[in-house]
Regions:
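Bacterial N-terminal signal peptides that target proteins for export
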Residues: 1-9
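Bacterial N-terminal signal peptides
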Residues: 8-17
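Periplasmic polypeptide-binding modules associated with outer-membrane biogenesis and secretion
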Residues: 21-111, 121, 135-154, 159, ...
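Residue-level preference for beta-strand/loop junctions
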Residues: 31, 114, 147, 186, ...
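Gram-negative/organellar outer-membrane beta-barrel architecture
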Residues: 91-243, 316-320, 330-331, 404-436
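C-terminal outer-membrane beta-barrel translocator/porin domains of Gram-negative envelope proteins
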Residues: 106, 230-361, 369, 377, ...
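Extended low-complexity acidic/polar segments
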Residues: 189-200, 272-300, 377-422, 431-435
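Short basic (Lys/Arg) and small-residue
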Residues: 372
């Protein structure tokens, strides 16, 4: 008990110290009329990347509240380890310390079917100084070393030619045996996601993707199967930041059509076609609220798929990216899903800048505890037989590039024993693309 009290006291001390440091970095009296704005420390970042995030304007009184929000938004770009402001009279100067933009490093991620994947990656977090992130990767499963392989190229940015059109491009080659769905996944994927900010808190979403599955035995064609995906949606986003959200709500609705191109005609008195063809209705809702160093988050991801869905596209529940009450296996597979989560975070150590041998980065520590709800079914209405629940706890390390490293332990009364997990990136993000 004494250790727990000391731990809480230490965390509160860090929190107070962080607030005190923030106040001192302002060094600008509230209400001072801003006559000009300057930037310092932008070695690789173009000024317009910063300017579009600023709320304090020349000719207006300086607001510390606006700066606090500016700082969160600028940190959300994942380009800077430190952001501070100073003013000499009305001359407002923003100072930045940039994150090391070239990252040659081991590549890793966790998936439900391949477990921990390791490999090599080369990433540039700020291509041309325009907040464009590009990354090439090779990964192999630690469980099936050099047998389950993945080759990937990713590129993304929140803007396109100065327009508020966020985009994310993905090229993925997979050579891997899927022991959850029991088939050899030799596939190619090209995917483009768009996010156009129509209003300050309203975005129009679009997606288009092409997949080619080699040796796709579930399509009645052992050579290959080609599938197109295209979808439209909208999102209301009132979060303070997209990364490490502390406050706000997010709601997204997306309608996507998936259709196999090389469908096969089958006749037996009556002709019909065979092939995957379904619609996906997605709802993604998130809400966060802070009280001191505590952050409460509640999320719900629901995907309903009317139509013909083949086994290689079934959802799987079990693992660090979906449901932490069990390990992934072929038992909990289904066409439709609902993932529910309630999580409490304790910010033990808020984001801290650091530098080693000229490489700038940041780190933070959060303690987490929560509840996972898993609902998965194939047809009709789901019942209690389709539901499982679990509690979990762990430690999150907040770091650049991958958002966070997650060390978690889950327990489900249905299983009766703890499950240990390691993951990267927020679960609300990885649960959207956990298949790969």
């Amino acid at each position: 008990m004494k250790k727990l009290v000391k731990l809480v006291g230490l965390a509160l001390l860090f929190s107070v110290a962080g607030s005190f440091a923030t106040e001192n970095t302002l060094a600008c009296p509230e209400g001072t009329v801003v006559s000009s704005i300057q930037f310092e420390g932008l070695e690789h970042t173009k000024p317009r990347v910063v300017e579009r995030e600023l709320l304090n304007k020349a000719g207006e009184p300086f607001s510390a509240e606006k700066f606090d929000l500016e700082k969160r938004r600028l940190q959300d770009l994942d380009l800077f380890t430190e952001v501070s402001v100073d003013c000499n009279g009305g001359n407002l100067k923003y100072s930045f310390v940039e994150i090391f933009r070239w990252i040659p490093a081991p590549a890793g991620k966790t998936t439900e079917r391949d477990g921990l994947m390791i490999g090599l990656a080369l990433a540039n977090l700020n291509v041309l100084g325009e907040d464009i992130r590009a990354e090439v990767q090779y990964r192999t499963s630690s469980e099936r070393f050099l047998d389950n392989n993945e080759y990937a190229f990713y590129a993304s940015s929140p803007y396109l030619f100065g327009l508020p059109l966020g985009w994310n491009f993905e090229f993925l080659r997979t050579d891997s045996y899927d022991d959850i769905r029991d088939y050899q996944d030799d596939s190619w994927l090209i995917d483009l996601d768009l996010d156009y900010q129509l209003l300050p808190h309203l975005s129009i979403l679009g997606t288009v993707a092409y997949r080619e599955l080699e040796k796709a035995v579930f399509t009645f064609d052992e050579d290959s199967a080609e599938l197109w995906e295209y979808g439209l949606g909208f999102a209301f986003d009132f979060r303070d930041t997209k990364i490490d959200t502390r406050k706000g709500v997010y709601y997204e609705y997306m309608l996507t059509h998936v259709k196999q191109l090389d469908r096969i005609a089958i006749c037996g008195g009556r002709c019909y076609t065979e092939g995957e063809d379904y619609w996906e209705l997605l709802t993604d809702a998130r809400a966060y609220y802070p009280v001191g160093p505590f952050v409460t988050g509640a999320t719900a991801l629901v995907r309903y798929r009317p139509g013909e869905v083949y086994r290689f596209d079934y959802f799987s529940h079990g693992g660090v990216n979906s449901y932490r009450g069990r390990y992934a296996d072929g038992e909990r597979l289904g066409v439709h899903e609902a993932l529910l989560n309630l999580e409490e975070r304790f910010v033990l150590l808020d984001r801290q800048p650091a530098s080693i041998a000229g490489v700038n980065f940041f780190y933070g520590v959060q303690l987490v505890a929560g509840f996972d709800g898993s609902l998965i079914w194939n047809s009709g209405r789901p019942g209690w037989d389709n539901y499982e629940g679990a509690v979990y706890g762990g430690v999150h390390l907040v770091v650049p590039a991958v958002d966070r490293l997650r060390f978690e332990v889950g327990y489900s009364p249905d299983r009766g024993e703890p499950k240990f997990f390691f993951g990267m990136i927020e679960k609300v993000s990885t649960s959207r693309w956990r298949g790969r």
